[in-house]
Amino acid sequence: ALQHKKIKTMQSKTIMGIANLIESRDSNTGTHVKNTSNYVSTLAKAAKSAGIYPEIITEEFVNLVENAAPLHDIGKIAIPDCILCKPDKLTTEEFEQIKIHSTEGGKMILKILEDTTDEKYIKIAYEVATYHHEKWDGTGYPEGLVGEEIPVSARIMAIADVYDALTMERVYKKPFPKKKALEIISNDAGKLFYSVPPLF
């Protein structure tokens, strides 16, 4: 049991190391990994307390999605610096390149964790990396999943990701106040997100 705990601790540290490496390449992200991980934790715990998807959002699920959240942008390793670190808005072509980070992220997770015996963790890590840009109305990427087709873990990750993007400063935009960011997300319920309002 002690050996298993040591392995899990080492795995967690390795994951955070990889996540921080990605973040260090992208000056736009700032504390994105840490922020989104905290938001995912808050959302997952609140959803569990509210009895949302009780058959899915268990105590184990909350722990797994918290630990998987830092890997959601791991696929950005595959994106060239000239695009990833661009301080201005991306062109249509550049955005198409950015979009591949979701599928690349899923592939990387399966490769990195192929020797891991924790299949539930691999599944959730794969989901948050691959599907956190899917939208409830089917207009997201990479697969254009609709509604309930989108894994719950990815839906939670999506809200955390968008909330952090809205409240962070960019060269081309000022941060939205938290209240306004929540209002924007709530207004998009049923279109970009599932019809349950964010639980901050």
Where is each model-derived feature located?
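Histidine- and acidic-residue-rich, metal-dependent catalytic cores
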Residues: 13-200
